[in-house]
UniProtKB/Swiss-Prot annotation:
This is Biotin synthase. NCBIfam families: bioB. [2Fe-2S] cluster binds at residues 97, 128, 188, 260. [4Fe-4S] cluster binds at residues 53, 57, 60. Pathway: Cofactor biosynthesis; biotin biosynthesis; biotin from 7,8-diaminononanoate: step 2/2. The lineage of its organism: Bacteria, Pseudomonadati, Pseudomonadota, Gammaproteobacteria, Enterobacterales. It catalyses: (4R,5S)-dethiobiotin + (sulfur carrier)-SH + 2 reduced [2Fe-2S]-[ferredoxin] + 2 S-adenosyl-L-methionine = (sulfur carrier)-H + biotin + 2 5'-deoxyadenosine + 2 L-methionine + 2 oxidized [2Fe-2S]-[ferredoxin]. It comes from Sodalis glossinidius (strain morsitans). GO terms for biological process: biotin biosynthetic process. Its EC number is 2.8.1.6.
Length: 345
């Protein structure tokens, strides 16, 4: 999936400056060169450990520094996670993403995280986790457990980043992505529109992502969900056309990546979402909640997909995947499963 093209800030800005309809037309042409039109990859995201995060990301209701009314929860039991994954699979999801509100996971939690990955993978689902920063050994353990994707967003441009987060550096994020890639895990990384950034920052974010040694296989583009109690609760609303522009530019700059229409869909009408799909978005989070914020329910999404003639992209398992799933399923059936019910931290 690597690409030899190196994007400049000026090139990205030129795309943002194109007339809206011309930009959408180009993005749709690029999209059709690499993906089946009218297909959308569907993921489900579960918060496996909620709140009490020590970081200061100004957009996040899970930070312990802000009074948002969110009740913190310890790491879920493994069986609870597997039950949620099974429901997601039965509802049509092909990837199950597990997110924990940590700066980084503790080594004591790694066996439980490995069991979650193995159990979800045994169901035939792709697996994704977002756990914060990882050390080399933690990355290797997740890779050996069979983790398919790791999410670690860059959030915004390097220049604007310090206005949003101070508890980890931009380089920390890039280093984590590098470790994940070197371990053979696919990368999921994107950003947020509506933090107070300008067009230069949106262009800068996409330049950073597109110029990674290998661009992310999955690029989530989030619209800020404003939560009372966070420093960004009173930010101005994002102009839908500017959000759609960001989707289109991401599609053109990262033609082989899945561009995910991520957080903020609950605030979008059907017309805005339709234009996002036209602009090259071909992945969504499916289910009524994204970590702690609202998301359209499955029934609403299926109704919209029907109106637009969109089909859910089916996962094609590799021979290695099938063999690993069979092995993991056998291990889960024969193992003493008592530890699945006593995994809370």
């Amino acid at each position: 999936m690597s690409t030899s093209q190196r994007w400049t800030q000026a090139q990205a800005r030129a795309l943002f400056d194109k007339p809206f309809l011309e930009l959408l037309f180009e993005a749709q042409q690029v999209h059709r060169q690499h993906f089946t039109p009218g297909e959308v990859q569907v993921s489900t995201l579960l918060s496996i450990k909620t709140g009490a995060c020590p970081e200061d990301c100004k957009y996040c209701p899970q930070s312990a520094r802000y009074s948002t009314g969110l009740e913190s929860e310890r790491l879920m039991q493994v069986q609870q996670v597997l039950d949620a994954a099974r429901k997601a699979r039965d509802a049509g999801s092909t990837r199950f993403c597990m997110g924990a509100a940590w700066k980084n996971p503790h080594d004591r939690d790694m066996p439980l995280l490995e069991q979650m990955v193995q159990g979800v993978k045994a169901m035939g689902l792709e697996t994704c986790m977002t756990l914060g920063m990882l050390n080399d050994r933690q990355v290797q353990r997740l890779a050996e457990a069979g983790l398919d994707f790791y999410n670690h967003n860059l959030d915004t441009s390097p220049e604007f980043y310090g206005s949003i987060v101070t508890t980890r550096s931009y380089q920390d994020r890039l280093d984590t992505l590098s470790k994940v890639r070197q371990a053979g895990i696919k990368v999921c990384s994107g950003g947020i529109v509506g933090l107070g950034e300008d067009i230069r920052d949106r262009a800068g974010l996409l330049v950073q992502l597109a110029n990674l040694p290998t661009p992310p296989e999955s690029v989530p583009i989030n619209m800020l969900v404003k939560v009372k109690g966070t420093p960004l609760a009173d930010n101005e609303d994002v102009d839908p056309f500017e959000f759609i522009r960001t989707i289109a530019v991401a599609r053109i700059m990262m033609p082989r990546s899945h561009v995910r229409l991520s957080a903020g869909r609950e605030q979008m009408n059907e017309q805005t979402q339709a234009l996002c799909f036209m602009a090259g978005a071909n992945s969504v989070f499916y289910g009524c909640k994204l970590l702690t914020t609202p998301n359209p329910g499955e029934d609403r999404d299926m109704a919209l997909f029907h109106k637009l003639g969109i089909n859910i992209e089916r996962r094609t398992a590799t021979q290695g995947d099938v063999a690993q799933q069979a092995q993991l399923a056998e291990e889960l059936l024969t193992a003493d499963t008592a530890h699945y019910y006593n995994a809370a931290r």
